[in-house]
Amino acid sequence: MAKAKLRILYGEGDGDVLAKQAQAFEKAGHVVEKVEGRKAAEEALKKSAFDLVILGSTLSRNDRHHLPYMVKKANSETSVLVMHADGSRHPYVDACTDTGVSMESVLNRIETMKIAGMMPQVAAAGAGR
């Protein structure tokens, strides 16, 4: 089965980090909307639906805490990945990685998540039997 192409909202507090790391998600075949800061992330959530929201380590701790609530309020099926260990304690965070892990590790973590955007491919594969 081919890898699922996900629609990702990726937020960081630092524009340089955002641009550099978003390239890795795009190179893996995902469609990425990049946002810098909490307000931009909230606006994007109001305008579009996403399979996965990734909250980067350069967002403030307060933003990484507040945004998962906003994601689930916008769409309870959207998965949330926090690129910081403090995400493990949050009830609305589906997965987290340690700060500073390689992008390959982050991409591997995404592949192990049960993301709603991946499910239609699995269902379609099962229907063809």
Regions found by a protein language model. Give the residues of each.
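A generic structural motif
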Residues: 28-32
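Conserved acidic segment of CheY-like receiver
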Residues: 5-15, 21-25, 53
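Structural motif
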Residues: 11-15, 55-58, 83-85, 99
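Short, flexible coil/linker segments at domain boundaries that flank nucleotide/cofactor-interacting
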Residues: 1-6, 75
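Output/docking surface of receiver
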Residues: 81-129
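Conserved phosphotransfer microenvironments
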Residues: 54-73
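Conserved phosphotransfer cores of two-component systems
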Residues: 46-48, 71-78, 86
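Acidic, metal-coordinating helix/loop segments flanking the phosphotransfer/catalytic sites
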Residues: 34-52
